[in-house]
């Protein structure tokens, strides 16, 4: 049985090298939260209305990457944020997704403006996409970042890490858990449907929902859900 000397790190490579180099370790380290409790409410608690269609900025995938290329030359890496809204049906968590057509699903969110704060930007985007039309301000509660994805090139593939040898990713996407109030009214653009997809349907289902949405069951497994 080998024993690691007390003054020697047991992590990193080569042996004894800490990959963070104590860069992120301070004396005033925050206490670790071992369990995070999130309240979920039934889907039937929420009312869904409609509003005018909300169209994408780009008419095609090729046009989207061309605009991304042009903007990258001017302002650098694109920053996008998306919100994960969860309800429950029969004590099973469901994620609210926007459906366009018959096979395309997305999380609500979008591009941040240059210099825009991530949380404030996501609140703005959530209001634009799902905000009610009667002037009542929606209260979006955003406390937890649950995932980071990077696009290394001007192409569809995205990864939950920056691939080796990539020094200038073209897009950084952050996923945030948006905690819903007990009751709320959402206005959905007419060209979309808002669907509630159970976690068991998303799990390991990249062909149906893409790699990001299908990874949500793993990302959400760290939370302790309370079914109200």
UniProtKB/Swiss-Prot annotation:
Entry-linked InterPro entries: Cleav_polyA_spec_factor_su5 (IPR016706), NUDIX_hydrolase-like_dom_sf (IPR015797), NUDIX_hydrolase_dom (IPR000086)
The Nudix hydrolase domain, residue ranges: 77-202
Location of the motif Nudix box: 110-131
Protein localization: Nucleus; Cytoplasm
Entry GO CC: cytoplasm; mRNA cleavage factor complex; nucleus; paraspeckles
GO biological process entries: cell differentiation; co-transcriptional mRNA 3'-end processing, cleavage and polyadenylation pathway; mRNA 3'-end processing; mRNA alternative polyadenylation; mRNA processing; positive regulation of pro-B cell differentiation; positive regulation of stem cell differentiation; post-transcriptional regulation of gene expression
Signal peptide: none
Coiled-coil intervals: none
Alphabetically ordered keywords of this record: Cytoplasm, Differentiation, mRNA processing, Nucleus, RNA-binding
Pfam families found in the cross-reference section: NUDIX_2
GO molecular function, one term: identical protein binding
Residues annotated as site: Interaction with RNA: 56, 64
Keyword Glycoprotein: no
Region ranges (Interaction with RNA): 103-105
Role noted for this protein: Component of the cleavage factor Im (CFIm) complex that functions as an activator of the pre-mRNA 3'-end cleavage and polyadenylation processing required for the maturation of pre-mRNA into functional mRNAs. CFIm contributes to the recruitment of multiprotein complexes on specific sequences on the pre-mRNA 3'-end, so called cleavage and polyadenylation signals (pA signals). Most pre-mRNAs contain multiple pA signals, resulting in alternative cleavage and polyadenylation (APA) producing mRNAs with variable 3'-end formation.
PANTHER family (alphabetical): PRE-MRNA CLEAVAGE FACTOR IM, 25KD SUBUNIT
Subunit architecture: Homodimer (via N- and C-terminus); binds RNA as homodimer. Component of the cleavage factor Im (CFIm) complex.
Family: Belongs to the Nudix hydrolase family. CPSF5 subfamily.
Name of this protein: Cleavage and polyadenylation specificity factor subunit 5
Organism: Danio rerio (Zebrafish)
